[in-house]
């Protein structure tokens, strides 16, 4: 019997004993989840919690949906004072929680065979797994099929424009008065780097791109400089919205598919969390001509078929919590193939839980078909820049590559020097 299965069995026996003793009050645990403005994800989490409460009468859950930035702010203080929730939302790019000893390994509670093998390393340290990887994603380039065609650009059957072809798309969009690339960095530390770093991945290939993110390759490398120069040209042509610096992530979705509208939108595939909400709640209008193209192939690129795959929204257990049995049982109840299938069906997004694609029934089957096509025969690189960058390097990435460089406020040379100063290992 797997360790997680054994723990669940023992916990169940403990609950039975407590029940037979009578009069025992249920144990209430607290849970903080992200996604207050993403209905499908919110409904999925709520349903899993309610199912758990129905099955485990000795545990109840006080569930709160809180914006991610607020969770992080509150949790950073709460874990130190002993006031953190029993279970809370976390992403792998917040290593200080694990480094500080604030997270409990889930191995003793969860059957790890129910997690995708590629998702476990994101939460593994010293042989232990510390997070339940519910949300996974690839970085995609969404586009408005009608608008792109209207400005005179034909997307080939490969769904991948050349470097010159994407430059032409930007020029034609600007000439037609349509923003070529919807993007904003008003409330996130990463969107401004998506186009550049996906281009760098395709230019360098997985090995050298990994060296770049690990501080082993200079941003002054000629291939990196060439790619940065190309993206700087797109910026100078007017690729991004004039409101780039203040446009928030949710607003950039609306900007793309509602008002004023844009040709393309680089975004992780959790795009669907907002896009598939009702139009009145900020989602895509009915009949929106959504397409997915590959990021452009770089001239002389080592890996035009490369793509980023990553783990995002996960749930962790507070190591100093007093109700870890109930908290662990909750995560164990979530980690099933059926729940993974329901996530993909309801949210239209990848998951680190194992699932059965043959059982997925969705009103967004056309979207799934195109997403699967864009991810066929690709070479994945695991993790985004902020999964690798830490401390001063991460701060510099946010200041330079997320903000100043795509806003046209800094040169290629200066951006490379600042990144090397903060990130390049001696």
Question: Residue locations for each model-derived region?
Answer:
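Glycine-centered hinge/linker elements that transmit conformational signals in sensory
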Residues: 168-172, 213-245, 295
């Amino acid at each position: 019997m797997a360790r997680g299965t054994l723990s669940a069995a023992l916990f169940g026996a403990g609950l039975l004993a407590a029940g037979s003793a009578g009069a025992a009050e249920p144990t209430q645990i607290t849970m903080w989840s992200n996604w207050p403005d993403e209905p499908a994800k919110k409904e999925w989490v709520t349903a899993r919690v309610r199912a758990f409460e129905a099955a485990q009468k000795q545990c109840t859950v006080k569930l709160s949906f809180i914006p991610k930035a607020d969770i992080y702010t509150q949790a950073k203080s709460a874990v130190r004072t002993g006031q953190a929730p029993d279970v809370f939302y976390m992403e792998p790019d917040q290593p200080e929680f694990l480094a500080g000893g604030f997270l409990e390994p889930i191995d003793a509670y969860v059957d790890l065979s129910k997690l995708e093998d590629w998702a476990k390393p994101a939460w593994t340290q010293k042989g232990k797994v510390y997070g339940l990887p519910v949300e996974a994603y690839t970085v995609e380039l969404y586009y408005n099929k009608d608008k792109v065609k209207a400005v005179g650009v034909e997307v080939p059957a490969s769904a991948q424009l050349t470097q010159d072809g994407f430059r032409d798309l930007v020029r034609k969009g600007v000439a037609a008065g349509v923003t070529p690339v919807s993007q904003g960095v008003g409330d996130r530390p990463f969107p401004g780097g998506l186009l550049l770093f996906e281009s760098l991945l395709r230019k360098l290939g997985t090995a050298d791109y990994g060296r770049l993110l690990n501080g082993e390759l200079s941003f002054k490398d000629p291939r990196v400089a060439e790619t940065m120069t190309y993206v700087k040209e797109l910026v100078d042509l007017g690729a991004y919205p004039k409101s780039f610096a203040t446009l928030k992530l949710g607003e950039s979705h609306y900007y793309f598919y509602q008002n004023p509208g844009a040709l393309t939108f680089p975004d992780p595939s959790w795009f669907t969390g907002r896009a598939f909400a009702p139009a009145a709640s900020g989602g895509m209008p009915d009949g929106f001509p959504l397409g997915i193209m590959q990021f452009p192939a770089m001239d002389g690129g080592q890996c035009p078929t490369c793509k980023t795959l990553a783990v995002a929204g996960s749930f962790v257990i507070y190591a100093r919590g007093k109700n870890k049995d109930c908290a662990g049982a909750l995560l164990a109840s979530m980690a099933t193939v059926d729940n993974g299938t329901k996530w993909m069906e309801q949210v239209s997004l990848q998951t680190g839980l194992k699932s059965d694609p043959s059982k997925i029934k969705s009103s967004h089957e056309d979207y799934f078909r195109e997403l699967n096509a864009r991810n066929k025969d690709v070479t994945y690189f695991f993790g985004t820049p902020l999964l690798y960058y830490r401390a001063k390097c991460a701060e510099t990435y946010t200041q330079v590559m997320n903000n100043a460089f795509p806003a046209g406020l800094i040169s290629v040379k200066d951006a490379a020097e600042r990144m090397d100063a903060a990130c390049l290992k001696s």
